[in-house]
């Protein structure tokens, strides 16, 4: 490469990539075709299909993974690098499709289905249906994922069921398929009522508990961190599902349930909303769905009483404030005496 023999250099990196797994990262990072003609010259140097597929794989990392998949699949449908290219292509698609924003108390996540590249959708569907790759279940998973994005929920279910049957019976793999099945199930839900809530409940309980377990294992590092159950990427699906359900409730004018699933930064700015939430908590609803929603929410009835008391105090309505504070059963200890705060080191 330093001698500006780019075609030869890149061909050699492809050989390393193909034959020396331990140096694959180095081969990827050092692969630098300058122009199309350099890449074509490298292709002409290949001695077999394996080298040619490796060269296209490196091309796919930097340029167009979808084109690379098409080329490698034509060379050899069972080539070992196809799975890597598929993963790369999906990651790029997700960067275009998925969006998250952090608004004070919560993370809200959205999926823009319209941004799905039709080229990769068509190619993955064709390959999945032919079922002749080295890891057919991975193509079934991605095909199912894409069908969900296209709104073809029955097709998605078929692909994911096929993936579940043919995939290795490992916890990580099977749970990953389950995540896509949950995404499909939530996506096809357009109205929330007792029936749809009960249908969603078991999978959402599993998902949110799984996410808590992963967060705890990550925060408090232990041997459990390396367990397969803790390697799942659940955070976006958790955030997206809560945002999606919250938006459905909002469309149905159910402000309380919408708030429980995804907090709004100004929800309590309106007194009528505060009263609705207080009434909800006082009704002490204890269905399994309500318990799930309440477990996701960080505000309690005591917090509402305290907030109301503070608001009354600001308005110099002391008697009303005392009434609200008496309802609040929280036994918090102040870090310092608020009446001698002017004294230095009052916290001590």
Give residue spans per PLM region.
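Extracytoplasmic/secretory-pathway proteins
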Residues: 1-348
